[in-house]
């Protein structure tokens, strides 16, 4: 069993999934993961499918050098965005895995929320490309490790209302006036 960077507060109401050494760009996957953090599971799955179909974009906030602007980024209150298809597919597969783990634990999939998602750099893979005049340059890839923890949302119980509405506290002057009126009417 692999280590996770953080543990869930309520282990009985949460499930985990992780993907080590995924051959997908670290920077794109990091930005996609930040976009789905704290989303309900069903919304996150819909969002990733929309990213694959280029209906919604992923906002690029940290690794945004040279990233073009797109109109879809306005809903995230930013200007730069892209549609990292491969990252979205990998994260969608990871969410499906976590959902299967939740189903195995007997959790309700409709109440699950992406509580924690983290993307770490994995060891770079080295290849080579041949250049002019007999030179060789490195041709590196940037894989990543991804871990996700889904937690069942707590039900918010509304405060019970009393049958009788609470009476306003009256000041001493108003109480005195009420007593005087009562005495006069008798």
Swiss-Prot record:
Pfam family, one: Ribosomal_L22
NAD listed as a keyword: no
Signal peptide bounds: none
KW Ribosomal protein (keyword) present: yes
Disordered as annotated region, ranges: 157-186
Entry-linked InterPro entries: Ribosomal_uL22, Ribosomal_uL22_CS, Ribosomal_uL22_euk/arc, Ribosomal_uL22_sf
One annotated GO molecular function: structural constituent of ribosome
GO terms (BP aspect): cytoplasmic translation
PROSITE patterns hit by this protein: RIBOSOMAL_L22
Listed CDD domains: Ribosomal_L22
Keyword set, alphabetical order: Ribonucleoprotein, Ribosomal protein
Family of the protein in this entry: Belongs to the universal ribosomal protein uL22 family.
Name of the protein: Large ribosomal subunit protein uL22
Originating organism: Drosophila yakuba
Phylogenetic placement of the source organism: Eukaryota, Metazoa, Ecdysozoa, Arthropoda, Hexapoda
Gene: RpL17
